[in-house]
């Protein structure tokens, strides 16, 4: 009997859509999206029947689902152009479920007995359900200092969360950002759909544009789940 392995890939989109006028974080301006060259205006540059649109966007780096590099926190840290692809693409990933409605703090106990080394650690709080509402900006879940230190000591590759901020915004020292980015561990914030992922056994990608001199930029974050099926090949047995 021969076995034929068939690989099927399933992709889970983990990013919010960036739209004109949306607010990601109170106090930061919304993106402005418009035509730089409209289809109508482009017609004079091309043959009859040929037209294009060239878009223009004005936005702050912290828009939508975005990734922080060490440069976001530290002047001498790696910026977007220096970040190795090995730290943001094709990462073995693990999801920790922290969607407790009455508990904001996510401490190190959630990671106990887990091997986070070389993995993308994704923290599923369910807070993305409030995206686009006023509630999203108030009382969000966050990672405590000891939890961030556990991930840094454990050698995690990247940390992501589906919340407003990985830190408690009332703590102006931003301990989670400080610890993780000092350890050269990228952070992805404002994620979504983490509930659609398995706890482990998938790859994670969050790749921003390669920009020099910037520490943050939106990403198209996604998980890739591979299913391997074994099917029997017909084979005649002679008696």
Question: Each predicted region: which residue ranges?
Answer:
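Active-/binding-site microenvironments in catalytic and ligand-binding cores
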Residues: 1-239
């Amino acid at each position: 009997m021969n076995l034929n392995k068939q690989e099927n890939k399933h992709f889970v989109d983990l990013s919010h859509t960036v739209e004109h006028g949306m607010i990601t974080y109170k106090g930061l301006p919304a993106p402005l999206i418009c035509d730089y060259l409209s289809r109508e205006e482009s017609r004079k540059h091309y043959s009859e029947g040929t037209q294009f649109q060239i878009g223009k966007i004005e936005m702050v780096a912290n828009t939508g689902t975005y990734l922080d590099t060490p440069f976001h926190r530290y002047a001498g840290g790696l910026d977007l152009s220096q970040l190795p692809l090995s730290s943001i693409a094709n990462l073995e990933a693990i999801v920790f479920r922290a969607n407790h409605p009455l508990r904001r703090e996510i401490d190190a106990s959630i990671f106990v007995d887990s091997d986070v080394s070389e993995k993308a650690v994704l923290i599923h709080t369910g807070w993305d359900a409030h995206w686009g509402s006023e509630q999203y900006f108030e009382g969000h879940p966050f990672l405590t200092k000891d939890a961030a230190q556990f991930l840094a000591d454990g050698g995690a590759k990247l940390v992501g969360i589906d919340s407003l901020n990985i830190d408690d915004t009332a703590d102006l020292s931003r301990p989670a950002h400080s610890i993780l980015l000092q350890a050269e561990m990228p952070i992805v914030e404002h994620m979504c759909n983490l509930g659609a992922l398995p706890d482990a056994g998938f790859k994670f990608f969050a790749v921003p544009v390669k920009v020099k001199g910037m520490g943050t930029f939106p990403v198209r974050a996604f998980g890739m789940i591979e299913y391997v099926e074994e099917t029997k090949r017909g084979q005649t047995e002679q008696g």
